[in-house]
């Protein structure tokens, strides 16, 4: 999944290539996305390239090629000029969900003796990505696996937590909550936009989101930029 800004940049590049055959400049991309500096564009392009959406052509200035578009925006692309992507909402973000329908939570299934846990989408164990706001399906789990409280599940994408035994394709079970102890693995919401699965640490007054893979750097944020959305209590792996 892509963040809102990644979606916007990908579509902006695609539309510019379609109209002129020439990729936009970094200044044009910065202005289009209303970013303060070009370093933000560099990070977005790197993330899009890592996910296989674009490719930078070597030895050519401003050479970008769009390899694919997300399934959510590919249909009817020519009929719309601006895409309004889904971002984290409700208890996984800053925008409250529609009042007519409460957010799904784990519920008891009296007929089978299991607990139904909603799968809410995907979570990055790598570069942060937006979590899907809608329930995709549910898992039936034994009550002793998760204990009391409200829970949801997320599918892991990325390899930054492999040393903690969490691999790409695993499903993590998260207990909802807005606090965590140092060393616990949490779903962290960064800047009310991006969700990531990382180990929670405190560095003085700041919050550190620590990977369990030496290839990834620990990211440090001010306390007002990070909100805990729940902590890891279980993991499911299919073979």
UniProtKB/Swiss-Prot annotation:
Catalytically driven reaction(s): Hydrolysis of Ala-|-Gly bond in repressor LexA
InterPro entries for the chain: LexA, LexA-like, LexA/Signal_pep-like_sf, LexA_DNA-bd_dom, LexA_repressor, Peptidase_S24_LexA, Peptidase_S24_S26A/B/C, WH-like_DNA-bd_sf
Keyword Transcription: yes
Entry-linked Gene3D superfamilies: Umud Fragment, subunit A, Winged helix-like DNA-binding domain superfamily/Winged helix DNA-binding domain
Keyword Transcription included in the entry's annotation: yes
Enzyme Commission number(s) of this protein: 3.4.21.88
Positions of the DNA-binding region: 26-46
Pfam family, one: LexA_DNA_bind
Listed GO MF terms: DNA binding; serine-type endopeptidase activity
Listed GO biological process terms: DNA repair; DNA replication; negative regulation of DNA-templated transcription; proteolysis; SOS response
Catalytic residues as annotated in Swiss-Prot or TrEMBL: 160, 198
Annotated spans, Disordered: 90-110
Top class in the EC scheme: hydrolase
Site (Cleavage): 125-126
Keywords: Autocatalytic cleavage, DNA damage, DNA repair, DNA replication, DNA-binding, Hydrolase, Repressor, SOS response, Transcription, Transcription regulation
Family: Belongs to the peptidase S24 family.
Quaternary structure and interacting proteins, as annotated: Homodimer.
NCBIfam families associated with the record: lexA (TIGR00498)
Main function: Represses a number of genes involved in the response to DNA damage (SOS response), including recA and lexA. In the presence of single-stranded DNA, RecA interacts with LexA causing an autocatalytic cleavage which disrupts the DNA-binding part of LexA, leading to derepression of the SOS regulon and eventually DNA repair.
The protein, known as: LexA repressor
Originating organism: Brucella anthropi (strain ATCC 49188 / DSM 6882 / CCUG 24695 / JCM 21032 / LMG 3331 / NBRC 15819 / NCTC 12168 / Alc 37)
